[in-house]
Amino acid sequence: FGHFEIQSFKFNHYKVCDDGFKSADLLDKSKLTISGHFHHREERKYENGKILYVGNPFQMDFGDINSSKGYYILDFETLEYEFTQNKKSPEHHKLKLSELLTAKDKKWQKKVAGNFVKFYVDQQITNDDIDALLQMLSKLKPLSLNVDYTNRIDFKVEDDTGYDFSG
């Protein structure tokens, strides 16, 4: 067990470790190395053993979107381990206006309730409609609701699209 940096393992979805221990050096000393330094869960099997990064037990930020988080149970006799997914902690989700407007069901609402949400306004919508939509999203009680207008088309009151967000 350790809190190691091991070369070529991922810190997260975007960055790989260039420094630290070499896998071969650790596996020369042990058949199983378990580390918790990186937040990204990753397992590698080699001819002479395994290296396991357990990762965080819960999502930390929007970089963890679509990452399965949880914990491991280790059998000290056999060195076998089993991952258990954390289904209790809040998650981070990104939603786009265009996705909500074309959704055929309301499954997206589960992504909002009790979670951290980044909402992208990626198409034209009136000020009144965006206000109504944000009120509706807020009623689902997200832990955090951040709105990103970066890619929006300018809002125009006269371009009333008449979207129905009543649920």
Identify the meaning behind each predicted range.
Residues 12-77:
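Conserved beta-sheet core of the metallophosphoesterase superfamily
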Residues 2, 70, 139-142:
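Small-side-chain structural scaffolding
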Residues 1-10, 114:
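Short acidic, glycine-rich surface-loop motifs adjacent to enzyme active sites
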Residues 1-3, 34, 118:
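Structural motif
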Residues 76-167:
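Accessory, non-catalytic peripheral segments of nucleic-acid enzymes
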Residues 5-7, 40, 58-59, 124-126:
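Short, solvent-exposed loop/turn segments at secondary-structure junctions
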Residues 3, 37-39, 93:
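Histidine-centered active-site/metal-ligand motif
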Residues 1, 71-73, 92:
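Conserved hydrophobic/aromatic beta-strand scaffold that supports enzyme active sites
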